[in-house]
Amino acid sequence: MYTSGYANRSSSFSTAVNNTARVATTNTTAGLISEVVYREDQPMMTQLLLLPLLQQLGQQSRWQLWLTPQQKLSREWVQASGLPLSKVMQINQLSPCHTVESMIRALRTGNYSVVIGWLAEELTEEEHAELVNAANEGNAMGFIMRPVSARTHATRQLSGLKIHSNLYH
């Protein structure tokens, strides 16, 4: 049987459209990277913002990874916060360059529902792009926690929360 080239193009076009629609649908549930800037003298504000989300993510079968600079998470705090102790992993005492690299690797695996890392400096555009790609690949969330002192905060912008989301752009 003979089929024209036009018919073949038409079917390949509809396949391409279906594939694009499938990718678009998949991307709406893809990963997210967000930067949370908070005052060091008011850590409770950050907990109020993030704990409900972390509790909800704790219901997934995946881990939560905390990359903390020096402090160690208290078992009592994790349990009192309603987070699943059996799904929370922590790595501490990482240098800032290792924190970003570790976040990228962890997000990419898909083993973590959320990866939280502390950084003193803002991300470069390249680092942010790498984190976004890794979060999308692993269908995970990443939070960059950036503390500022009360003195620094007074001279900076008034907004303390920077949320990157494809839902609003």
UniProtKB/Swiss-Prot annotation:
A biological process from GO: division septum assembly
Keywords carried by this UniProt record: Cell cycle, Cell division, DNA damage, Septation, SOS response
Lon protease binding: annotated segments: 162-169
Gene3D superfamilies found in the cross-reference section: P-loop containing nucleotide triphosphate hydrolases
Residue spans crossing the bilayer: none
UniProt PTM: Is rapidly cleaved and degraded by the Lon protease once DNA damage is repaired.
Induction statement: By DNA damage, as part of the SOS response.
Chain positions of site Essential for degradation by Lon protease: 169
Region described as FtsZ binding: spans on this chain: 106-112
Cross-referenced Pfam families: SulA
Subunit structure: Interacts with FtsZ.
UniProt function note: Component of the SOS system and an inhibitor of cell division. Accumulation of SulA causes rapid cessation of cell division and the appearance of long, non-septate filaments. In the presence of GTP, binds a polymerization-competent form of FtsZ in a 1:1 ratio, thus inhibiting FtsZ polymerization and therefore preventing it from participating in the assembly of the Z ring. This mechanism prevents the premature segregation of damaged DNA to daughter cells during cell division.
Family affiliation: Belongs to the SulA family.
Protein name as it appears in the record: Cell division inhibitor SulA
